[in-house]
Amino acid sequence: MASLPHPKIVKKHTKKFKRHHSDRYHRVAENWRKQKGIDSVVRRRFRGNISQPKIGYGSNKKTKFLSPSGHKTFLVANVKDLETLTMHTKTYAAEIAHNISAKNRVVILARAKALGIKVTNPKGRLALEA
C-alpha cells in the first residue's frame, strides 16, 4: 500500500488561469483563452495583469500525475481491471469509475483489500446507500 520513494511534489501554480475580463462580463466564461489582440495588455505581459499559462509552470517529470499519497491513479470499472494492478501496488492506486453501482463497489473494494491495492475513492456512493 505504501508508495515508492519520490521527490517532494511541488505544484508551481495552483490557482486556475482565468480568462481576461471573465470577472467583468458575465458572457465571458472563466475558461482560459489566449489573448490575440495587437494591443492586449495581457498578451504583452504588462505589470498588474493576469498571468498566462506557460511551460515554466509544468511539474517535475518524476512527480507529474502523482496523487498526494505518491501513487498514480488507474481507473477501475470491474474486478478484472484490479487484477492488472497486482504487480504494481506501490506505483498505482485504483480509482473506481463514477458510473459503478454501490453493489459492485463493495465487491471491488473487498477484492482490492485482499490484493493489497490502495483505492483513492473508497467511500464514494457507499456512504449514501449504507
Curated annotation (Swiss-Prot):
One of its GO terms (molecular function) is structural constituent of ribosome. Pfam families: Ribosomal_L32e (PF01655). GO terms for cellular component: cytoplasm; cytosol; cytosolic large ribosomal subunit. Coiled coil: none annotated. Disulfide bonds: none annotated. Its main location: cytoplasm. Component of the large ribosomal subunit (LSU). Mature yeast ribosomes consist of a small (40S) and a large (60S) subunit. The 40S small subunit contains 1 molecule of ribosomal RNA (18S rRNA) and 33 different proteins (encoded by 57 genes). The large 60S subunit contains 3 rRNA molecules (25S, 5.8S and 5S rRNA) and 46 different proteins (encoded by 81 genes). This is Large ribosomal subunit protein eL32. The gene is RPL32.
